[in-house]
Amino acid sequence: AEALNWLVFPLKPQSKIPLTQHGFKDATRNADQIIQWWTQYPDANIAIVTGAESGLFALDVDPRNGGNEDFDQLSTELGINLQLINTPQSLTGSGGFHLFFQYPATQVIRSGKLSAGIDIKGDGGYVVAPHSIHPNGRAYAWEGESDPQEGIMLAPAPSKLLALLVGKAASQGATVPTYRNQWVD
């Protein structure tokens, strides 16, 4: 995480609940702190903070809520097969996936719902990272050859996707992000 310059923090084992007192506000890039956490809690899950501070955001696709169909429809509407973009993608323990992009320099991406089956993980959010274990016992993993530790860089999001995400946030009003759904994967 430190090499990737992403903010991380520990989650309770096989959980999406923060292990530290202040949750994502305790997130760090500091290698010594990261080593201390996982030495103390070797079975802890890993959370990656999303948003401007980490320099990334993610689309969180959940098939249990129609996410695969929503994602296909989104790709069709944008005229872009988003899964073919060379950017990190992780498989979630619930059978969904996270598609990671560079956080844009000039726009704000807030966490929220894009559709019933797709969450936006931006400012105020986090995702459970690969090498974690879902509450159902399945592991999170990097998809194929999209592991950022193997050199895959965050791609910029397509401009059509950014326009949709920024428009969605504007239509929802400039409110403080809610954390009610932050642990949904």
Segments predicted by a language model, with ranges:
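Conserved phosphate/metal-binding and DNA-contacting active-site motifs used
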Residues: 1-182
